[in-house]
């Protein structure tokens, strides 16, 4: 994706959301901003637990919040990591959840506070989601 300015505001919302992350163990805050089909945005943050398996990532928090609000059509997601100098992509669990609720061509933007950013699609971060393709048939 070449037109990064198209996602600047969404990325800024993710970066702002990251300030509210609860990360007392890793000190690695993450924010996500999920654009809905009506143009509104729902944010999420990572929420850690000392039992790391119970931690919830920012991407899933945003998606689960939107679903709890009765929203199910998402057009783009931005993920911001202010505590890293490099972009950090979604974990495997988040890739699975993102692919469950977003189309393969939906934009995914992730980046750091250093200005490094990667722009791709759901299919780019989860290229072998055959289950999604089967469900569409």
For the regions a language model picked out, list residue spans one by one.
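C-terminal binding/interaction regions
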Residues: 2-23, 71-137
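Short solvent-exposed loop/turn micro-motifs enriched in small/polar/acidic residues
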Residues: 25-27
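Short beta-strand scaffold segments in enzyme catalytic cores
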Residues: 29-36, 109
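Compact, glycine-rich, soluble single-domain proteins
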Residues: 46-60
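Short, solvent-exposed cationic patches
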Residues: 58-78
């Amino acid at each position: 994706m070449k037109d990064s300015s198209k996602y600047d505001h969404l990325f800024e919302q993710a970066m702002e959301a990251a300030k509210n992350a609860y990360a007392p163990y890793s000190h690695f805050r993450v924010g996500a901003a999920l654009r809905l089909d009506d143009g509104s945005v729902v944010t999420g943050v990572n929420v850690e637990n000392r039992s790391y398996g119970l931690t919830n990532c920012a991407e899933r928090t945003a998606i689960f919040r939107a679903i709890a609000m009765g929203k199910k059509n998402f057009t783009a997601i931005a993920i911001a990591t202010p505590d890293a100098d490099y972009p950090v992509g979604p974990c495997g669990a988040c890739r699975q959840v993102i692919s469950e609720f977003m189309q393969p061509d939906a934009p995914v933007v992730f980046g750091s506070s250093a200005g490094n950013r990667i722009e791709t699609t759901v299919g780019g971060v989860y290229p072998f989601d055959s289950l999604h393709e089967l469900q569409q048939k």
